[in-house]
Regions:
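Short loop/turn segments that connect beta-strands within beta-propeller blades
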Residues: 29-33, 72-76, 125-128, 167-172, ...
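Loop/turn residues immediately N-terminal
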Residues: 21-25, 64-68, 118-122, 161-164, ...
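Conserved beta-propeller blade signature
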Residues: 15-18, 58-61, 112-115, 154-157, ...
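Blade-level signature of beta-propeller repeat domains, shared across WD40, Kelch, NHL, RCC1
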Residues: 202, 207-215, 235-239
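An edge-strand/N-cap motif at the start of beta-rich repeat modules
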Residues: 1-2, 35, 208-223
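Generic beta-strand structural signal
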Residues: 11, 28-30, 54, 71, ...
């Protein structure tokens, strides 16, 4: 059943397509009598940044102001999007998991997907989500999650208060360990983070890159930009 008036109808390859005023294009499979995921407009135009990630056969792309759209690459079908907790346009609560629909980062790690927003982060395993836990003190309570790097069972996150680290198996049950300017980072907000295979983590800020060791978890130096860069993206390639 559907709640909106159909304004047009078309049949293609045993799929009925119903055009509606407010709910997009509803699709009904006549072969098995089931409703498919509707085609719904995101309502977003001219997005400045759309992060993408792939886990298995599923392509994810974060659309600011909408959520995380999903496509099954094996079938070509669009899937139910991941949306904000308070924004569930007939999709059901199992995919309304996001703390915000302003998506900053997506990072795939095996079958897991890390989603960073301007008001928290979640780990999605394909069927359920875990919200990132934060501490009680300001220096362990990040709000904005700009980038992720996963290495050695630890998730490193570029946040508005520096580089924060969680155990990848305990993101929802343990407080993060965060490094900021008081620990030697070049600036507060860290917009990019990468980890290499030698136990080093690199956090990019608007004033340079902080060089961090995984054990002990501390800042050991920095690469200074010399001037404000607005952003210092980092990437590790081989050695």
């Amino acid at each position: 059943e559907y709640d909106d008036d159909a304004v047009d109808l078309a049949l293609f390859s045993n799929i009925v397509h119903l055009a509606t005023d407010d709910e997009g294009v509803l699709r009904y499979d006549l072969s098995n009598g089931t409703w498919l995921t509707p085609w719904i407009s995101t309502g977003v135009n001219g997005a400045d940044n759309v992060p993408v990630a792939v886990t298995g056969d599923i392509l994810y792309f974060g659309i600011p102001g909408y959520g995380v759209a999903r496509k099954d690459l094996s079938t070509g079908e669009l899937m139910t999007p991941l949306t904000e907790l308070s924004n569930s346009p007939g999709q059901g609560t199992s995919t309304s998991i996001l703390p915000s629909d302003n998506i900053y980062a997506l990072e795939a790690d095996g079958s897991d997907l890390y989603i960073g927003t301007n008001n928290g982060a979640v780990k999605w395993d394909g069927s359920s989500s875990s919200s990132f836990q934060t501490g009680r003190n300001w220096d362990t309570r990040p709000q904005q999650y700009f980038d992720f790097a996963v290495s050695g069972g630890t998730v490193y996150v570029a946040t508005n208060i520096g580089v924060c680290a969680w155990s990848s198996s305990q993101v929802s049950s343990s407080d993060p360990d965060c490094l900021n300017v008081y620990d030697g980072m070049p600036n507060w907000a860290t917009y990019s983070v990468e980890a290499d295979g030698y136990g080093y983590i690199f956090g990019g800020t608007t004033s340079g890159v902080g060089i961090i060791t995984a054990s002990p978890y501390e800042v050991i130096g920095e690469w200074e930009a010399g001037e404000q860069t607005q952003n210092a993206p980092v990437e590790v390639i081989g050695d």
